[in-house]
From Swiss-Prot:
Keywords: ATP-binding, Chaperone, Nucleotide-binding, Phosphoprotein, Stress response. Residues 600-617 have a biased composition (Low complexity). The modification Phosphothreonine is found at residue 199. Transmembrane segments: none annotated. HAMAP family: DnaK (MF_00332). This is Chaperone protein DnaK. SUPFAM superfamilies: Actin-like ATPase domain (SSF53067), Heat shock protein 70kD (HSP70), C-terminal subdomain (SSF100934), Heat shock protein 70kD (HSP70), peptide-binding domain (SSF100920). InterPro entries: ATPase_NBD (IPR043129), Chaperone_DnaK (IPR012725), Heat_shock_70_CS (IPR018181), HSP70_C_sf (IPR029048), HSP70_peptide-bd_sf (IPR029047), Hsp_70_fam (IPR013126). It comes from Histophilus somni (strain 129Pt) (Haemophilus somnus). Acts as a chaperone. NCBIfam families: PRK00290.1, PRK05183.1, prok_dnaK.
Length: 635
């Protein structure tokens, strides 16, 4: 059985880890970095770039460089949060036929799971390069507050990337695993404050040690799936745009190139202000008008940054209060606070968390790597490599069905430990009703329409009877991934209908299979592209070395020996500019064959040069003069 890798699929950055012996290990990518930007770019020559290479070219290709895709995964185009992103993202967010939020790249509509799969493929390849074997299984993390549609979409992304997702686990829970695995402190209750690039979670987790077995039990979780570092960046960008408009009278919002440069500069300034009190944002030639080029140079202080984002930090504290209340705990009962996610490096965030909990957060957890490490530990548990660890997670949102009057009747309360199963008996609302529609909902509101619709199905063939007489048993079953299965059974006839909840939108199995095939086809195209580049490089090297030899020893060849070599060099040079690898290989072989006499002449010249050098050194050896020396001792 191969290794089960752990992947933190982040909004801004992603990370992959694996159990190396009995210790989890974060794996460096091809660029030598421990985290990979969750950025995907589609270039003009149909190449797909992922990670740092995609980030580097973002300024010149803003419309086809996709980032923060996790904010769209499993969401409807009409969602308020998606509409906010539509207004600020440089790439085009569009409405899919099923109502989902998709992205349009070069006129082609793409689903968020399809795009996220590119990042997962990069993580898979990173792990394979390290392990030296094929990887087919993974544990992938999601924000604790992700709903069913978002979890399903993340699983779909894994399938498209060629991974069997063995488990979806919540990010704060994974961080707790990373923190608590080697802590021999017995029982303790911790709060995990996870403020990442696009999402925020707060989980209260109890770590118990009984007879050598560690149990990680989530008591409560809460969060905001549209609050994170990207929102902090946008505040900085908007401030810079407004200041520039005041100074220069030019609105940069209409210039995608300038906005992409501002995004990079804004993120860099925000990071610098975690350690410095002020920074300069300096972008020469940001734009131009009739009077000439314009330069942006704005000072940004830490105090100004904190004023810009104060309400975002305050917004993160609301779910903290709710989670504590749901867990039935007071602040004083929390033993440790762990910070996860890059945005928690901001001093204001650390200060507000410390003020709320009345204690300094822990500094011994890497906020960028803890989640991937925890996922790798869970992978080790599933593979049987890690013993004596039990993970008890919860469902973040209540689940129920719509009943008469448009009310949501809850079957499974939020923060119920999963996996779980719950049944309840309902009846008909009309006389002689022969079918019922089971409308499955997720959320905390009593009004059904105010909650997230997860899907609906019909139970037909109910025997005619007065209203309220038939007994229909509805059963909710949530698996360890937090994925929901619902069944409805007519106790009178024994007829039963079951579904695994597919988001009321979501991707169909056919669409996922097509995307898997596309991904495999792309992998083949990528392999061919790599082979073509290698062939071109070999051709360039051969052209260069042959021309060098011609310049050095060409006069020793006759004109009839020299002409075919020069002709073959020119033909190879032309072939190397084309797209046909077979032709390049053929021209390489042709040049090697006609260059035989040139190679001989070159070798003869090298031998002659070596002989001359040796005789010179022998001659020089006769001139060696013996010198007398006197040893001087320290007095």
């Amino acid at each position: 059985m191969g290794k089960i890798i752990g992947i933190d699929l982040g909004t801004t950055n992603s990370c992959v880890a694996v159990m190396d012996g009995d210790k989890p290990r974060v794996i460096e990518n091809a660029e030598g970095e421990r985290t990979t930007p969750s950025i995907i770019a589609y270039t003009n020559d149909n190449e797909t770039l992922v990670g740092q290479p995609a980030k580097r070219q973002a300024v010149t290709n803003p419309k086809n460089t996709l980032f923060a895709i996790k904010r769209l995964i499993g969401r409807r185009f009409e969602d308020q949060e998606v509409q906010r992103d539509v207004a600020i993202m440089p790439f085009e967010i569009t409405k899919a036929d099923n109502g989902d939020a998709w992205v349009s790249v070069k006129g082609e509509k793409m689903a968020p799971p399809q795009i996220s799969a590119e990042v997962l493929k990069k993580m898979k390849k990173t792990a394979e390069d390290f392990l030296g074997e094929t990887v087919t299984e993974a544990v992938i993390t999601v924000p604790a507050y992700f709903n069913d549609a978002q979890r399903q979409a993340t699983k779909d992304a894994g399938r498209i990337a060629g991974l069997e997702v063995k488990r979806i686990i919540n990010e704060p829970t994974a961080a707790a695993l990373a923190y608590g695995l080697d802590k021999g402190k017995g029982n303790q209750t911790i709060a995990v404050y996870d403020l990442g690039g696009g999402t925020f979670d707060l989980s209260i987790i109890e770590i118990d040690e009984v007879g050598g077995e560690k149990t990680f039990e989530v008591l409560a979780t809460n969060g905001d799936t549209h609050l994170g570092g990207e929102d902090f960046d946008n505040r900085v960008i908007n401030y810079l745009v407004d200041e520039f408009k005041k100074e220069q009278g030019v609105d940069l919002r209409n210039d995608p190139l300038a906005m992409q440069r501002l995004k990079e500069a804004g993120e860099k300034a925000k990071i610098e202000l975690s350690s410095a009190q002020q920074t300069d944002v300096n972008l020469p030639y940001i734009t131009a008008d009739a009077t000439g080029p314009k330069h942006l140079n704005i000072k940004l202080t830490r105090a100004k940054l904190e004023a810009l984002v104060e309400d975002l930090v305050a917004r993160s504290m609301e779910p903290v209060k709710v989670a504590l209340s749901d867990a039935g705990l007071s602040v004083s009962e929390i033993n440790d606070v762990i910070l996860v996610g890059g945005q928690t490096r901001m001093p204001l965030v650390q200060q507000k968390v410390a003020e709320f909990f009345g204690k300094e957060p822990r500094r011994d957890v890497n906020p960028d790597e803890a989640v991937a490490i925890g996922a790798a530990v869970q992978g080790g548990v599933l593979a049987g490599d890690v013993k004596d660890v039990l993970l008890l997670d919860v469902t973040p949102l209540s689940l129920g069905i719509e009943t008469m009057g448009g009310v949501m009747t809850t079957l499974i309360e939020k923060n119920t430990t999963i996996p779980t199963k719950k049944s309840q008996v309902f009846s008909t609302a009309e006389d002689n009703q022969s079918a019922v529609t089971i409308h499955v909902l997720q959320g905390e509101r009593k009004q059904a329409s105010a909650n997230k619709s997860l899907g609906q199905f019909n139970l037909e063939g109910i025997n005619p009877a007065p209203r309220g007489m038939p007994q229909i048993e509805v059963t909710f079953d949530i698996d360890a991934d937090g994925i929901i299965h619902v069944s409805a059974k007519d106790k009178g006839t024994g007829k039963e209908q079951k579904i695994t909840i597919k988001a009321s939108s979501g991707l169909s199995d056919e669409e996922i299979q097509q995307m898997v095939r596309d991904a495999e086809a792309n992998a083949e195209a990528d392999r061919k592209f790599e082979e073509l580049v290698q062939a071109r490089n070999q051709a360039d090297h051969l052209v260069h070395s042959t021309r060098k030899q011609l310049a050095e020893v060409g006069e020793k060849l006759s004109a009839e020996d020299k002409a075919p070599i020069e002709s073959a060099v020119n033909e190879l040079e032309t072939a190397a500019k084309g797209e046909d690898k077979t032709e390049i290989d053929a021209k390489v072989q042709a040049l090697i064959q006609v260059s035989e006499k040139l190679l001989q002449a070159s070798q003869q010249q090298a031998q002659a040069d070596a002989g001359a050098q040796q005789s010179q050194s022998t001659k020089g050896g006769d001139d060696v003069v013996d010198a007398e020396f006197e040893e001087v001792k320290d007095k």
